[in-house]
């Protein structure tokens, strides 16, 4: 029987510029697994860390940013990993930052700030597309989901 685990996070970083939402996408370095894959901030949850703490740490490590505001998206990505015969559930976060001055780590070789449609089309995996769509939907809804799921740090 397959195990179900939570060991990684996805976070979609955005900024507001000229009244428009712009998303950050990062291109994986050639020397890393999934080379040249465009993604949001992603990474493993370390021992003793919560998922949201891992998202903040990964944000700082991969981009140099600290979050201005952060919320839990109303979506959990998932995938099956044949190696280890396990199903991964991936918590998804929306993270707002206050500028576009990215400091890349060696994990990525390029970045871009783009509108939602471009970001969505740049991402490859369905889980990524669904995750960023959930964040974008929450940002453009007239309900209280962000208020209800905002993380205080």
Give short role names for the model-derived ranges.
Residues 39, 87, 113:
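Short aromatic/basic micro-patch
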Residues 13-15, 27, 92-96, 115:
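Short, well-ordered beta-strand micro-motif
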Residues 92, 103-135:
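NUDIX/MutT-family hydrolases
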Residues 60, 64-100:
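Active-site segment of metal-dependent pyrophosphate-handling enzymes
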Residues 5, 34, 87-89:
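Residue-level preference for beta-strand/loop junctions
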Residues 127-153:
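Charged phosphate-binding loop/patch that engages nucleotide di/tri-phosphates or the phosphate backbone
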Residues 1-23:
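Conserved N-terminal beta-strand and adjoining loop/helix that marks the start
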Residues 20-61:
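Conserved Nudix-box catalytic region and its N-terminal flanking loop in Nudix hydrolases
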């Amino acid at each position: 029987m397959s195990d179900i685990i939570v060991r990684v996070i996805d976070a979609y970083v955005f900024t507001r510029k000229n009244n428009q939402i712009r998303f950050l996408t990062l291109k994986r370095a050639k020397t890393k697994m999934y080379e040249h894959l465009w993604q949001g901030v992603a990474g493993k949850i370390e021992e003793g860390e919560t998922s949201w703490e891992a998202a903040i740490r990964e944000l700082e490590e991969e981009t140099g940013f600290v979050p201005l505001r952060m919320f839990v998206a109303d979506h959990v990505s998932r995938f099956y990993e044949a190696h280890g015969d396990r199903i991964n559930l991936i918590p998804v976060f929306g993270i707002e930052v206050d500028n576009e001055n990215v400091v890349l780590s060696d994990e990525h070789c390029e970045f871009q700030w783009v509108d939602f449609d471009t970001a969505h089309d740049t991402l490859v995996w369905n889980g990524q597309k669904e995750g960023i769509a959930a964040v974008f939907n929450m940002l453009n809804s007239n309900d209280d989901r962000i208020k209800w799921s905002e993380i205080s740090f």
